[in-house]
Amino acid sequence: MGKKKKIDKNKDKTVRSINNNIRSSVRKLNPILRGIVGKKVDVAIRDLQFSEKRITRDIRKTISSAVANAENNFQYDIDKLIVKEAYCGKKITMKRFRPRAEGRAAPILKPYSSVTIILSELNKVESHGTKS
């Protein structure tokens, strides 16, 4: 017999949304995701909307999905939601070949990534530091 799981009632409730197949590399996604962490959801969506990067459309959709999850599944107030975490990971890399001179071929790598967005309510995030 195993130990019983301890249930922490004070655990911070979060909402997450995962987009598993984004056609971009992790290197291009990371700076965008770092820019939205800690912001309110509407501010993050606005910042992504006015960004010139192609991939921000997919990130915006993922945030909108997380907001819908928070509103419909957990009845959170969407005005109080902030982006608690946003990170990405490597997925598959499609390998293609481009014909070159004298019968040679050059590889083309087409990377895919997964994006995870975690939202939390503003009053549930603990502040750090000694000043109030």
Positions of predicted regions on the chain:
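Short beta-strand/turn micro-motifs at beta-sheet edges
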Residues: 19, 104-106
